[in-house]
Amino acid sequence: CGVGFVANLSNEPSFNVVRDALTALGCMEHRGGCGADNDSGDGAGLMSGIPWDLFDDWASKEGLVPFERTHTGVGMVFLPQNENSMEEAKAAVEKVFTDEGLEVLGWRPVPFNLSVAGRNAKETMPNILQIFVRIAKEDDADDIERELYICRKLIERATKSASWADELYFCSLSSRTIIYKGMLRSEVLGQFYLDLQNELYKSPFAIYHRRFSTNTSPRWPLAQPMRLLGHNGEINTIQGNLNWMRSREATIQSPVWRGRENELRPFGDPKASDSANLDNAAELLLRSGRSPAEAMMMLVPEAYKNHPTLSVKYPEVIDFYEYYKGQMEAWDGPALLLFSDGRTVGACLDRNGLRPARYWKTSDGFVYVASEVGVIPMDESKVVMKGRLGPGMMITVDLETGQVLENTEVKKNVASAKPYGTWLQESTRSIKPVNF
């Protein structure tokens, strides 16, 4: 796969960010796969901040008031092809939102150009709509995201017995981020979704992904980015990870869910791809109160034992990994992961280090990460920092502060937030080896 992101350190939404991401994505075509028609891509997609100017413009044309941005969730939804099934699915979605006390503001048909899609993509293409909902009962931004997460889980549960259940899929449902994706080649994603050509589509960041399908056959929902992650690689431990997630479902609790943990289960889906299940696990940790960097460190730890730098300079990072090693098995395999919750954008490489990732920062306040260099035209004189991710390394961009943190800075901040070393000393019990 080919992945990358563009981020504006001033956190100013702009169309240029989206345009640069699409340019870079187009240069990643050789990293993806195509179907037998040589035109239907394994998948291509883009995650960004929500383009409120674009949606407010649509709302005004529809006679709607401008959206209350802090309390409005936007869902990018794949719906059944059959017209009657689509209406049933829409009604089921609306019922869950209404029952949860959310106000459904309307549905927006997503404009597209079908002529650039391949034959296989056209035959399997879902109806693509966006739903807008208002969340009045919550004021905290994280609680709003949790409410939308619960709603999506309830929708999945309410529709699982429907004949069209496999055709209903939320690419995203958030008040911060949105995802445009499909069974497309990278160079035509921006031509297919007409929104991506509109200069009102503005975002301070964009994650892009071109898929090469390995473990699962191409389908519209399996294009990436997923709801939190863009993944280049495979998770070779997926069966064990799913089994352990399932075994812990009954005991996982957090006060942030206010006793609603049962509504979140199941946490994994054996029918989904390895990337989708890793995304599910990351999203669960994020919505439970973890930061994106903390979630990535728990899921994809580096090879920390006998690490010369960590042992001497950052023992608190080793304490973090030791604390969580018995609570979360590593999702292992070649993996370059790009991630965002709309406030932080980042990338990390798993401990195998078998996927390329380059990054660079420019004097005009932009940070770029990509599977390879040369995907965006660049004035070299503007580059003030550059490097590559090695095994187990990470880089993050805080969009709200403009701070860029490289590897050990990220991990030190996460590991220093809690007294993991003290907890280990107080709670660890050694068991004598037993002869078998």
Swiss-Prot record:
GO cellular component: chloroplast stroma
Main location: plastid
GO biological process, one term: ammonia assimilation cycle
Cofactor descriptive note: Binds 1 [3Fe-4S] cluster.
Cofactor needs: [3Fe-4S] cluster; FAD; FMN
One Pfam family here: GATase_2
Name of protein: Ferredoxin-dependent glutamate synthase
Originating species: Hordeum vulgare
